[in-house]
Design a protein with these regions (language model features):
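Short, glycine-biased loop/turn motifs at secondary-structure junctions and
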Residues: 1-324
Length: 324
């Protein structure tokens, strides 16, 4: 990430510390293995065999369940120690948790369909692991923040993932979120990655080849929204062959226009039409976002369709002073 983050007043160097969560350098395998071996030692376990993989997704086939005779597996005992550590400390800041755990690690985790079991995030545990704590156990976790990607401790073996080759973000209020309009927002050395549009995880086609046909076949409304935003409404309307039925000034948003289009029959929806409007509130960059609403096919006038979306009649909507 090139932009700086808002510092947390409790930890003067939190911005520099959180940079580890977005580091794209190769893992420091020696440091990571030493720290993990020391954590195993705290559990009374010998150093594990280390298996390095090139992405979290590549870890899945390498993971094996703990032996049936193990009443308390290594990962469960480690989780108990982590819970005790975290009881004494809060996350570094709400922004740190939102940016690192929810906006980045959360989207990467959601992109892996298989169950991962207990695991830790290495560099992306930076949201709760403090720098320079002076606590010997926490310092081992801090070493992992500085040294590697995600990791999975198991009986006698530990699977560790390399860090990504790229992590692309954009500001989102006081935090950051994944976004890339040209390729994966997160990409790992084996080519596996995660595509994201303004913080929403999307299939690769949304970023790399959005088309009206793919948008119309997509069931997920958020994916459709992102794809249309990326393609652009003008291109979508042209590709989809939508016919403009009516247009009218938007009384709830002076200076803007409502447009009502006829929609062709679609598999997932009852007969409907598309109302194209402009958001009444201003985006962070000062622009107003165009958006589309699917409305019942019974409406022939955009004011009636817009009023329906607010639970109003067209006549009532026409008397609005300003909407948001």
């Amino acid at each position: 990430m090139s932009a700086s983050r808002r510092p947390d007043r409790r930890i003067p160097d939190i911005s520099a510390w959180l940079d580890h969560a977005f580091c794209t350098d190769p893992a420091d395998r020696v440091a990571a293995e030493d720290a993990i071996s020391r954590l195993y030692a705290l559990l009374g376990e010998p150093p594990p065999q280390f298996v390095w993989v090139l992405s979290p997704n590549a870890a899945v086939p390498r993971l094996r369940p703990s032996p049936a005779l193990s009443l308390e597996p290594v990962e469960a005992r480690l989780a108990t120690r982590v819970a005790a550590l975290r009881e004494r400390r809060r996350d570094l800041s709400p922004e740190a948790r939102q940016t690192v755990k929810e906006a980045v690690a959360g989207l990467v985790r959601a992109a892996i369909p298989q169950t991962l079991g207990l695991h830790w995030y290495g560099q992306q545990d930076a949201y709760w692991v403090p720098p320079g704590s002076g606590d010997p156990e926490l310092e081992l976790w801090a070493t992992l923040v500085r040294s590697c990607g995600w990791w999975w401790p198991r009986e006698g073996v530990c699977v560790v993932a390399e860090r990504p080759l790229a992590i692309r973000t954009e500001p989102s209020g006081s935090a950051y979120r994944l976004h890339s309009a040209t390729g994966p927002a997160v990409v790992y050395p084996d080519g596996w990655g995660v595509h994201a549009w303004h913080g929403t995880r999307v299939p690769s086609w949304v970023i790399e080849d959005p088309t009206a046909d793919r948008i119309n076949r997509e069931f997920n409304v958020e994916v459709r929204r992102c794809a249309v935003e990326h393609l652009g409404w003008a291109a979508y309307i042209e590709q989809a062959g939508l016919r403009l039925l009516s247009r009218a000034p938007d009384p709830g948003n002076p200076g803007c226009e409502l447009q009502l289009y006829n929609l062709p029959p679609q598999k997932w929806h009852a007969p409907s039409r598309l109302l194209l409007a402009v958001n009444g509130s201003v985006e962070r960059d000062g622009t107003r976002r165009r958006y589309g609403l699917r409305v019942p096919a019974e409406f022939d006038h955009p004011l009636d369709a817009a009023g329906w979306s607010y639970g109003l009649t067209g006549a009532q909507y026409a008397r609005l002073q300003r909407r948001t």
